[in-house]
Amino acid sequence: LWMELKMNGCSFPLAELSDGTVHLLLLLLLLNLPRKRGMSMLAVDEPEMNLHPAWQKLMAHEILRGESFKQCFISTHSPDFLDEFTQDFLEGHVNVIVFDPSSKRPLRQLDRNELRNELQNWTLGDLYRIGDPLIGGWPQ
């Protein structure tokens, strides 16, 4: 089996690509499977790993437009990646679950109505960057 990336008239064997690029290509392959052969659920742990922030945005957009799955669960620590889900979160297309180890219930779904005012001028990633108590994020 031989796979390569063709871009701008050049061919690159997968072995010569970065880990992040290979992961991105494999996820894009999964996201673009025909619906009838697709998955009922896609779970991805830290899809932003080894990716430039610009590629993280591309990956987020591809996940949002993906039609090869019915549900998608993503675990991330990247505010840049999280930024891209703000509008879909506000519109009710995306739910965000926060891990809070200090709580009796460590998994909590964010309430979009509770964050609506803050998200007028900020993104989910912004709130993560400043360690907003509702969303958690970077330690203070």
Residue ranges and their predicted role:
Residues 2-139:
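Switch/communication elements of ASCE P-loop NTPase nucleotide-binding domains
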